[in-house]
A protein has these predicted regions:
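Acidic, low-complexity cytosolic segments
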Residues: 1-30, 37-174
Length: 174
C-alpha cells in the first residue's frame, strides 16, 4: 500500500476551505481532491453510496489515459480538464499541478459553465499547495511510483469483489 502523504494541519484546513467554497458555489453534490496516484486526500459533500476511494483511483487512471491520448495526438502537455456527462450526474476533472486532481460531481441541472469557472478558481488556489506537495513527493519518489498501481489494483479489487468490502470501509465526510 502506498505511503500516505501527511500534510500540515494548516494545509488540510485550507484544502477543506477551498473544497467547501467550490461545492457551495457550484451546487455540486460533492467534490474531492486526490493525488495523481489515486489516493484520496480530502472530500466534501454528500456522497451517498459512492465509494470515494475507488472513484479517486478511477479518476487518476482516467487522467493518465487522457495524458497518453494527448501525447499520441502530438500535444506537448497532458490535457488538464475533462468532463463526463451522465444522465443524472456529471463529473468535471481538473489537473492541479503535476500531482493533484480535483473532481466535481454535480447533478445535470447545474450549468457546466458555473462548474468550469469556479473549478478554475479553486485550481488556481490549490496550485500553491500542489507546489508544496510536489516538493514532498520529490523527497520520496518511490511513493508515487508504487502508489498508482497499488491504489488502482485495490480499488478495482474492491469494486469487482464486493464481498471483500466491509461496513468499516465507508468514508464519512464532514
Amino acid at each position: 500500500m502506498p505511503k500516505p502523504v501527511i500534510l500540515p494541519e494548516s494545509q488540510v484546513e485550507r484544502i477543506e476551505q477551498i473544497l467547501d467554497e467550490l461545492r457551495a458555489k457550484t451546487r455540486a453534490s460533492y467534490v474531492f481532491l486526490a493525488d495523481i496516484s489515486g489516493q484520496l486526500i480530502n472530500a466534501r459533500g454528500i456522497t451517498g453510496a459512492t465509494d470515494l476511494v475507488t472513484l479517486a483511483a478511477l479518476t487518476a487512471s482516467n487522467m493518465a489515459a487522457t495524458a497518453e491520448m494527448a501525447r499520441q495526438i502530438g500535444e506537448s502537455q497532458p490535457f488538464r480538464l475533462m468532463f463526463h456527462e451522465g444522465t443524472k450526474r456529471n463529473i468535471y476533472l481538473s489537473q492541479v499541478g503535476n500531482s493533484f486532481l480535483l473532481a466535481v460531481v454535480f447533478d445535470i441541472e447545474v450549468q457546466i459553465g458555473l462548474v468550469r469557472l469556479f473549478s478554475k478558481r479553486a485550481t488556481e488556489e490549490l496550485l500553491a499547495l500542489a507546489d508544496e506537495y510536489e516538493k514532498i513527493v520529490q523527497q520520496t519518489p518511490s511513493m508515487m511510483e508504487a502508489g498508482f498501481d497499488t491504489s488502482l489494483d485495490e480499488a478495482l479489487d474492491t469494486l469487482l469483489n464486493p464481498s471483500k468490502k466491509t461496513p468499516g470501509d465507508q468514508i464519512i465526510i464532514r
